[in-house]
Amino acid sequence: MNLFRKISEKLKSYEDWVTEANYYLDEGIYDKAVECYLKALEKKNTNPIDWFNLAYALYHLEKYDSALEAINEALKISPSNIYFAYLKGLIHYKRGEIILAYKYLKKASEKIKNEELFEILGDISVKYGRYEEALKYYLKSYKMANSKNLNALFKAGKIYLLFGDIDKAYDAFNEILQQNPSHECKKIVECMENVVNAINSYEDLNNGLTMIKNKDYIGALKIFNKVLQIDENSDISYYYKSVIAEIFEEYKKALEYIDKSISIFNRSLYYAKKGDILYKLGDEEGAIEAYNKAIKLNSQNPYAYFGLAILYYRKGELEKSSNFFDKVLETYLEELSEEDISALNLYSLIGKAETTGIPKYYHEAMKYVDNLINLENSSRWWYVKGYIYYKLGNYKDAYESFMNALRVNPKDISTLKSLAIVLEKSGKIDEAITTYTKILKIVNSLQFTCEIDNILEKLRSRKPTNLEIPSVLFDIPVMYHKPNITCFYASNLWKYMANNNPIGAYIYLSFIESYISLDEISQMVNDIKSKLSLEMYRYCELIDDYKSDESVLMQIKELLQKLGCML
């Protein structure tokens, strides 16, 4: 058989070999096509098409050196053939000879309108940092008649991200999904939509905070649940749900919610709240661990220091407590609201007075309680003011403050009891008796009634009760963070970047930009935006394998510190 085949091959003409080679080429049987073209060229080597077809078959066999030799032969015979130049450009591209590839492909593109050609020119432009040119080629590739080159459109979308044009990138990716719903850009589009929904939720979150302040806790819960329906990863909504559960003394539920916040965003603020809740659940060790974790994540977290100060105060470890009250007073609190700053300073100054025995701290605390009363005519703040006067031995002003508290909340038992103690110490025994009698009419508890009856018996016998008003440090209101809009955006900027999502980070940074006025910070924002543009492009290249650049994370952290934002 081999002998017969050899004889048969010798009898074949040039035309026979070309016909057979063309057949194999059309069928994609490139190795056979190469054999036949070589046989044909042995008989006649002056037809440039044969050399071109040989080069084309070798190209598909990834034998690029031989392919280059063949296409050079074709070009020697027909140097102006644009299709030969096109193939030569492709071969150089595969050989990694990018400059030569660009030269021939660019020349070919003047007459050949081919989606693959334009896409490769786009890829080469990207390699040399000519992104505007690359975008032009990718869009040309996609917009070719009957083109379905979604890959080119995806690359165009990535360049839009590199330019920071989120809207055009979103439109490009959406166009891809209309034609291929399972395309890899689906994750990117979902990310963009989720971030926009989260940003739009700020007004709802702010309304929820207002409701908490106004003690409309059920209304606030509804708001935060609404936000979670829109953005299931709204860590701040779980934080506020934890706060509401803590206010209702449902500490296990509060712990569940704060753990959910932490699972979404490993944030110092949330560990401080977890410490508060664990302490109220009786887990002192767990609370201390949570507070220390909060401090490790952010050494400027006043809530963590305050939680530790209160914990050690109640344990009777006054030196430790005093040191942590110092930490609160030393911490720069720019991000916090005026109300939160005043409350933390107020209780910390009282704490310093009671852990050191220095009355001057009470005097310093007075200006903060006055500020809080000006912000909100609350019975709590009038009560604390009365307590401070009491500790300073000023029973007259303590009496006036407690009376002001009762004008806001006439049936508050703690205030009535403290008022009675002040009246007794002022020598106004009959008024003290009248006050205790009023308490009996309000409270319907056998144990409490017996306690008051014993007090009344002593007073009527003109015997001292030796009662003291308990420290306000044993009745601290639930503390929680109330971020302004800039810090809300900033914390989410950090969250998204820390969670390897530079697109979400970029969108939040764009919103922060509109609230920045200082030139120094504006320059930093512009620098971060530029780096995030590159990170977005890199994210689209890697998707699931993407990891945020540590240097960008550190720069974002520095920006947050300059903005006074607490993580």
Curated annotation (Swiss-Prot):
SMART domains reported in the protein's UniProt record: TPR
Matching SUPFAM superfamilies: TPR-like
Domain of life: Archaea
Keywords: Repeat, TPR repeat
InterPro entries the record matches: TPR-like_helical_dom_sf, TPR_rpt
Start-end of each TPR repeat: 14-47, 48-81, 83-115, 116-148, 150-183, 199-234, 236-268, 269-301, 303-335, 344-379, 380-412, 414-446, 505-538
Protein name: TPR repeat-containing protein MJ1428
The organism's taxonomic lineage, starting at the top: Archaea, Methanobacteriati, Methanobacteriota, Methanomada group, Methanococci
